[in-house]
Structure formats: C-alpha cells, structure tokens
Amino acid sequence: MKQVTGGVCAAQGFSAAGIHCGIRKNQAKRDLALIYSAVPASAAAVYTTNLVKGAPLTVTKAHLADGKAQAIVCNSGNANTCNADGIAVAEEMSALTAAALHIAPQDVIVASTGVIGQPLDLAPIRTGLPQLAAALGDHSDQAAEGIMTTDTQPKEIAVQFTAGGKTCTIGGIAKGSGMIHPNLATMLVFLTTDCAISAPMLHAALTGDVQDTFNMVSVDGDTSTNDMVAVPVSYTHLRAHE
C-alpha cells in the first residue's frame, strides 16, 4: 500500500468542491462541501450510537436503504439537530443537491456539522449549491475545508493498493477535534473508492473495519449527535471497459 495525492478525488470517477455560501459569518471559511460520483455508486455508512441523532443521519439512513448513492453534501456551522423542521430541511438539502447535479434526491448522502439546536437557514445553501456543483473538480482540499468546524487543519488522505491484480484507490476527508468518542462513527468521515465491491460486502467491510479504527479514538468522551462514516464506490473505470 502506498500513499498518493488527491484525497477523495484520487479514486477514479470522483470530483469534489467546497465554497463559502454564507452559513458561517466568517467569509474566509468554507461552509458547504460536495463530493460527486460520475455514475451511481454502491454506498454504505455507519452512524453514531448517541440516542439523540441529527436529522441528516435519519435522512441519509433512509436514502442508503438501497445501498446506492451518487453524491455527498455537507454543511458546516450548523448541525441541523434538535430542530422541529430538521428532517424537512435535510430532505430539502438533498433535493437541492439533486437538482444541481441532475440526479435523484434519494441518491444524496446529506450531513451537517456545527452548532446544535439552531434552525438551519436553507437560503445560503439554495443559492450556493448551483455554484458548488459548477465548481466540481479535483478539489478534495476544498471539500475538506468545507466540513471543518473547530478543526485546526483540514484532514485528507488517499492510498493505493493491489487486490486481485487490480489497482484500487481509497481517498478520504474527515473533520473532528472535539466531541470525539467511540460508538461509531466518532467524527464525520467521507471515503471514496474505485474498488469493485458490492454494497453488502462494502457495508460488512466498513462496519468491521471501524471497530479497530474510528471506534478506538477518544478525545473528550463525548459522542456527537451527527457522527457518520460514509463511503460510495465509483464504477466509472469499469464501465469504460464494458
């Protein structure tokens, strides 16, 4: 296994971007991130076991019931948690993302991170998503910045390895510096890969692997309401050879 550059864009078929849309007051801070697969992808996710869960997790779990996704959208600055309209807001965020990308809303993984208990204003997201979609490219670093809250620096990595004679790539971005404690998923983590793997096997691999990785991380003993590790698989390179 070797480390490569590119973050979530290192795996074939993925693009990403991050912008400041206005959720956060500091205009120098990106607050909206997008990861996109050029084709529908197998996908899996694991979630916090906190009894209080953010609305985005509820919506994402429903969307991933079929084991498929094509995009991940995440805002920072507001967790969309403990809000009466949280589910509706998360669903609308998915719909806005889907419209900007011309995909189905149920193929969008939605996540939010930030202050708990404050309503999430969709106006800046509604305005920013078309711009964000248009900016998609090899911008994993932007997406990594877009999901940060109290983090002191962005977190991204990508590795390559050989399996069955084929080169596979896994990329990832993450956020989290507080409210980190085992009981999955410890923090927000978005992974991408171009490995040929089915949705059931992907879920089994992810669920098993986090036990010896993310579930061993503790900073302050607080399990967050919005923790998630999500991974879509792009088959762009496979379709190119069909």
Protein language model regions, located:
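Glycine-rich, mobile lid/loop segments that gate access to catalytic sites or pores
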Residues: A100, P105-F214
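N-terminal amphipathic/basic leader segments beginning at the initiator methionine
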Residues: M1-Y47
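Channel- or pocket-lining gating/hinge segments that regulate access to a cavity or pore
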Residues: T193, V233-Y235
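Glycine- and Gly-Pro-enriched alpha-helical subdomains that act as flexible
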Residues: V217-S218, L238
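Glycine- and acidic-rich phosphate- and metal-coordinating loops
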Residues: Q70-G77, D107-T113, D227-V233
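Conserved small/polar residues in nucleotide/adenosyl-binding loops
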Residues: T236-E242
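Short, well-ordered amphipathic alpha-helical segments that serve as non-catalytic structural scaffolds
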Residues: V52-H63, A88-A100, H203-M216
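Active-site-flanking structural segment that lines cofactor/substrate pockets
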Residues: I35-G67
